[in-house]
Amino acid sequence: MSRPGHGGLMPVNGLGFPPQNVARVVVWEWLNEHSRWRPYTATVCHHIENVLKEDARGSVVLGQVDAQLVPYIIDLQSMHQFRQDTGTMRPVRRNFYDPSSAPGKGIVWEWENDGGAWTAYDMDICITIQNAYEKQHPWLDLSSLGFCYLIYFNSMSQMNRQTRRRRRLRRRLDLAYPLTVGSIPKSQSWPVGASSGQPCSCQQCLLVNSTRAASNAILASQRRKAPPAPPLPPPPPPGGPPGALAVRPSATFTGAALWAAPAAGPAEPAPPPGAPPRSPGAPGGARTPGQNNLNRPGPQRTTSVSARASIPPGVPALPVKNLNGTGPVHPALAGMTGILLCAAGLPVCLTRAPKPILHPPPVSKSDVKPVPGVPGVCRKTKKKHLKKSKNPEDVVRRYMQKVKNPPDEDCTICMERLVTASGYEGVLRHKGVRPELVGRLGRCGHMYHLLCLVAMYSNGNKDGSLQCPTCKAIYGEKTGTQPPGKMEFHLIPHSLPGFPDTQTIRIVYDIPTGIQGPEHPNPGKKFTARGFPRHCYLPNNEKGRKVLRLLITAWERRLIFTIGTSNTTGESDTVVWNEIHHKTEFGSNLTGHGYPDASYLDNVLAELTAQGVSEAAAKA
């Protein structure tokens, strides 16, 4: 989010470009599955910039500078990051910041997660923290950025304003991000084919740009009347709220100052910075019965009913959320006008959004029925039995046809020409695979060095399947690294929103904690399983039952979950979803994980197909 003065995003002209001949720091970012832009490290950004100078439409092999990013490639022409072993594609972007800001100085702010690992804040939040640190503010309130956290510089800690839990904070010096001067060709900032006359108008960019504008307005307003810094709040009493972070079901927009006083009591929980985005909200002060949780200066808060009755003529009543989730405006944008008007000192009455309905009414055992056309009500997966590993060369040769006279094109894995030796020559040696050999994949026809495909396969799950890095076509049966667990499914006599005359398929996933196997990130180390059993819902119609059958197949292939780092809590070595989205909100769609959602069934079928799970693949 841009900030007044130094440290914010560089100003742009009408076409969305930085002004010419102005120095700025370049930060490359990728969009995670929760629509948060996460920055690459400075080292990776320098590497991307170097490749960009040579070929603005080329590809960047991230593993050349970071061993943890070996599977990843960035295609500069389409502005997407591609993961070779899973086929996952994510948008990337190139952002510009003032050279005097945190990335320009190589300053990184991080918070400590439950596993003791350090997680970097999003770049906009990092810049805000650094600005406050440089101005010698004793503390910083992140409410205006959508997070109910207080940063205390004296103790270098972050405190949750509801649970009072503290986490350690650190400021680390790293390599400064790359500096650039001059105008930027459009192909470096947007995918080829983007509109040439206007900046991007997708919902995500609208949300980001509006949030930046709102933050500027809030800060400008509060600079005129900065409140005194309060004392540190008392430590939480013994036996207080647990430290686990709860997902915030709804958020309240606020015009509170960035330096506003800490709340006197607990409010609703919100995720830590860097967690999945929800509607930006700020926690309120001590909540009392019948009061709306609006943490902003002004008239005394009243109940929503009396507030509506007392709204004077001409004062807009703005919902905190787009409650129905309909229309061209993203739900998170529905209250943005309220923030801007409130920051400008105009009268605004905000109404509270309802809480999501996560679960159906209680159902007796006699009302639970099997799903028609789907045998059984349960599937279990056990610990993966270690089989003799398939020889990587044999797997690659099974799906490849040798090419005697390859074209003078790039191999998109190593970025060397196909007419020359593989970039893995001297790095990887496999008996019988010469570095100059080139092959063509049978179905899709894309060509690569055989040694490059062997390297890609060896870096993946090594399950006997191969995935084309270009078109994501899967050869063989792809399997995952899901831990052992149980999947149950049955009918319940309740309807989902949007399916009034249809019963509901309920899926219950349950995975216990355990020890990681050789296919997991840290073999021999314990992994956690938070939030289980997890309940998910489908309509009991033809397409819903089709999705269920394919989800069962995906479960048996261990593709539904994996072990990694939670984007919600930052916890590492924990069970997380694996690119196949589920609906976990039964009676509403306030979190984006519920109904009505007319495109969900088609979207999840496409996600399953991308994992190699489809009816066509089953018949093949």
Swiss-Prot record:
Pfam families: DTC (PF18102), WWE (PF02825). GO terms for cellular component: cytoplasm; cytosol; nuclear body; nucleoplasm. The keyword Coiled coil does not apply. One of its GO terms (molecular function) is ubiquitin protein ligase activity. It catalyses: S-ubiquitinyl-[E2 ubiquitin-conjugating enzyme]-L-cysteine + [acceptor protein]-L-lysine = [E2 ubiquitin-conjugating enzyme]-L-cysteine + N(6)-ubiquitinyl-[acceptor protein]-L-lysine. Belongs to the Deltex family. The WWE domains are thought to mediate some protein-protein interaction, and are frequently found in ubiquitin ligases. This is E3 ubiquitin-protein ligase DTX1. The gene is DTX1.
